[in-house]
Regions:
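Short, Gly/Pro- and small/polar-rich lid/capping loops
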Residues: 2-23
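Conserved mixed alpha/beta catalytic, RNA-binding, or beta-rich assembly cores of soluble enzyme
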Residues: 17-95, 99-108, 115-123, 129-137
Length: 139
């Protein structure tokens, strides 16, 4: 498997934004093309902020037949945003075959377990929306 880019899936989309959910569980994903790499900002809830940053770098998978990635995770103290940031990075990095930095901050005061599950699901949905939009047309 060759990690060289055959095309740049973000070339036609220097910036993209996706939103899903409502109220306390709403999330937004912004993608910004940075050269041949990507910066993702995942925010939501009542108090968007930066709670974690994940850097993902593509590599050949351990099985050697696909692209995978290595991740470095930096959470702010007492923040769990790294959970969604890492999940987003692990989905986008191999799909885009580029280095990606994901900054995440989603906060709603006293969120219930149900709201937290909805937030996680909404994060997955915006990533799928982004991947569908980016890969919808051949380049």
């Amino acid at each position: 498997m060759d990690l060289k880019k055959k095309h740049d899936p973000l070339a036609s989309f220097p910036t993209l934004s996706f939103s899903f959910g409502s109220g306390r569980t709403a999330v937004r994903l912004h993608l910004l093309r940075v050269g041949s790499d990507c910066q993702a900002i995942l925010i939501g809830g009542e108090s968007p902020h930066i709670g974690a940053v994940v850097l993902a770098v593509p590599r050949i998978s351990l099985k050697g037949n696909a692209v995978s990635c290595d991740c470095w995770v930096s959470p702010a103290p007492a923040h769990k945003d790294y959970l969604v940031a890492q999940s987003v990075a692990q989905k986008l990095c191999p799909a885009l075959n580029c280095v990606i930095s994901v900054s995440a901050g989603i906060h709603s005061d006293h969120a219930t377990e149900s709201e937290l599950q909805t937030i996680h699901a909404n994060c997955s949905t915006v990533v799928e929306m982004a991947l569908s939009a980016i890969t919808a047309e051949p380049f």
